[in-house]
Amino acid sequence: MGLPVRISAVTLVCRDIGRLAAFYRQFGWPEAPTSVPEHVVFQCANGVVLGLFSETTFEQQLGRLVEGFRGFTLTIHCEDEETVVRAHETVRRFDDVAELDAQPTRSGWGYGFGFRDPEGNVWGVAYKYGSEIDHRGGFTYP
């Protein structure tokens, strides 16, 4: 099967999310109605979202930032939980995965897992509750 052919979200991990959210609001991009102070999301063109995630919340949910972490994550959003499970099985077979969650997990936002590439770049594979993937593979944040 392989992984779905898409990058649907770029997430910037922010030391001062209030300051960065104010900066990005100046772009005039539509902000998701489900944004909260610690996780602000802007809908971009072609089904891609820009997410701002507070450093504190990131560390609480995904672990301490490691040296060399560049302050962003790449995310592949999936149509459903079953696709997340199949993607996890695929990534488990990759050579050189630096770190991989043992299994996908559920949380208040959805279902997914994370892994790091050989240079420490963080990837997420997720099904976000209420999201949609259109016929082109474009992602719409709820």
Region locations from a protein language model:
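Core segments of cupin and vicinal oxygen chelate
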Residues: 11-57
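A short, acidic/glycine-rich surface segment
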Residues: 57-63, 133-135
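N-terminal beta-strand motif that seeds the catalytic metal site of vicinal oxygen chelate
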Residues: 1-21, 74-76, 128-142
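Vicinal oxygen chelate
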Residues: 3, 6-15, 42-43, 63-142
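A generic structural micro-feature
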Residues: 2-4, 34, 65-68, 105
